[in-house]
């Protein structure tokens, strides 16, 4: 408990990494700027989510980083809010991708109505290996908070790779504990079917 009597959440692995290496966030930003300048295809996740929703949908980019996914969805005509725990990444998103609303915040404490964003979302996208970077103690809480921010009929798209100290079966069990059904499982953002040999998981979750 904090001095104010409010229970504190464990810091994410990303927070721990950036505490140990303060230059890590800037390196991450420049890495994706370089890839974008080289013409690399960075829009696989955004194409996937765009196909899930109607035009002018409300989309939450959860763990948005420097805004790669959310900005592409905004260019496609959607109303995007992006949240990330790292202020360096949010500053880069604001600089490189004006338009969406970019917010600093811990996903384990996600409460957008308290920040004046009262309308729910048609889709939540959590890409870029965000889930394995969470503190293990907060994973179910984060998924529960995602569920609470959905509009009726809304869906959550989560993607992350194997070998990151978060087994796919464990994630699916956490989703169930959070009141979510993983009705669609894929091994990539380009709709390849998931198998037990898959090294990547894309899960579509619904309440």
Label for each model-derived stretch:
Residues 2-65:
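Conserved class I S-adenosyl-L-methionine
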Residues 66-111:
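Class I SAM-dependent methyltransferase SAM/SAH-binding core
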Residues 112-123:
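A short acidic, Gly/Pro-enriched loop at the edge of an enzyme's catalytic core
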Residues 122-137:
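A short SAM/SAH-binding and catalytic strip from SAM-dependent methyltransferases
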Residues 140-152:
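A short glycine-rich, Lys/Arg-flanked "PGG" loop and its adjoining helix->strand segment in the class I
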Residues 153-160:
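Conserved beta-strand signature within the Rossmann-like core of class I S-adenosyl-L-methionine
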Residues 174, 180-207:
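Class I S-adenosyl-L-methionine
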């Amino acid at each position: 408990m904090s001095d104010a009597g409010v229970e504190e959440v464990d810091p994410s692995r990303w927070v721990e990494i950036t505490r140990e290496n303060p230059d890590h966030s800037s390196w991450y930003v420049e890495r994706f700027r370089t890839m974008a300048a080289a013409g690399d295809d960075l829009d696989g996740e955004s194409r996937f989510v765009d196909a899930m929703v109607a035009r002018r949908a409300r989309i939450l980019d959860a763990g948005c980083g420097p805004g790669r996914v959310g900005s592409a969805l905004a260019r496609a005509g959607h109303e995007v809010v992006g949240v990330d725990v790292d202020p360096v990444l949010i500053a880069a998103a604001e600089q490189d991708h004006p338009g969406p609303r970019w917010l600093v915040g811990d996903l384990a404490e996600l409460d957008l109505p308290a920040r004046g964003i009262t309308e729910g979302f048609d889709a939540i996208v959590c890409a870029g290996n965000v889930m394995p970077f969470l503190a293990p103690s907060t994973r179910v809480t984060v998924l529960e908070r995602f569920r609470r921010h959905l509009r009726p009929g809304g869906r959550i798209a989560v993607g992350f790779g194997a070998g990151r100290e978060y087994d796919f079966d464990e994630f699916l069990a956490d989703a169930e504990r959070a009141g979510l059904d993983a009705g669609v499982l894929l091994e990539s953002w380009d709709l390849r079917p998931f198998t037990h040999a898959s090294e990547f998981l894309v899960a579509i979750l619904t309440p």
